[in-house]
Amino acid sequence: ARAEGKEYKTYVVLSHLGIDTTTPVEWRGSTLAEALSNYAPLKGKRVLVLDGHSHTLHTATYGDNVTYNQTGSYLNNVGRVVYNSDRVLSHGVISHDEAKKNYQVNPTVKAMIDDIQAKYKADSSKVVIENSPVKLSGDRMDVRVRETNLGNVVADALLDYGQSAFTHKSNLAVTNGGGLRETIAKDKPITKGDIIAVLPFGNSVAQIQVTGQNIHDMFVKSLGSILQVDESGKTVLDENGQPLLEPSGGFLQVSGARVYYDTTLPAEKRILSIDILDPETGVYKPLNTNGTYYLVTNDFLAAGGDGFTMLGGPREEGPSMDTVFADYLTRADLSKYAVINPNSRTISISSADFAALNKKENAADPTLNPLAPVTPSTIAKD
């Protein structure tokens, strides 16, 4: 095996795939490790796969040359792999308690960390708005499973920004539920620290041009999880009697679109209809699979991350998502987001109930129009 024209004996793969059962087998870190062990150019080479995502404490060997290691989460363990140029001598983890017991604190490093923490605390305590009138849920069993008010307000912030920031007005906005990491409390100030806790990854806003077919395929992927079951094996239902999906970081929170779906159907057939907001008229119109649309999202999804291979290509980029979100919060009427699971944009419904609906939903509805509540963005467009 060669890289940059040079021969190497050892390869270290840093991945974030995981091994949990909700991840398709072909996307798992263990599948990658096994594939590398069977890859002829790597025979006789040493390969270390250092993985994450599923928060699993797991170590394994594949074939005679691939070692897989994952150390759990939240610094509970530190991975340790000892090897020489010929073979791995040992691999495993050092627990947090073991590290505290057997390793001494480096005072120079501690002083550096203390200084950084003090500066961060001072900056993150700055108040963005004095009071949040609603709880915005970032619970993983909300944002990774179905439409939530936090997902709506973040997606609305993206769509609002996309009305004037790019060459073309954005038609719709999406962000992955796995990128929303914390709840914003009711009846308390919202600080910069709260916003960073919700959006901790430093993603920037990005817009890409997509086809209607890309949008359809994107939502098929978003809504493709297996169904939740309880400890007795019984399917877990939502308030309307529809099966809930298993949590997925790729579940999309949406603005500027309404997606009706039936979770009782096979994953590839769940979507019943998709309507897209016309930013010029405020009217929702049926998706044209041959049409061209402008999608505003985060740079991770815009590049096709989280398995959204139908996305990607050239993009325009803006500032950080947390900056755009903070600006939107200062102008939005948050009382409109009081319902945690509104079921108004990604709408879980039975096929029978959908067939019986009066199709008035295609008319403009200001209660669902994410562009109505706020004035145009004043945030810097560069």
What are these regions (language model features)?
Residues 1-118:
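Functional cores that coordinate and move charged inorganic groups
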Residues 72-382:
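Catalytic centers of hydrolytic enzymes
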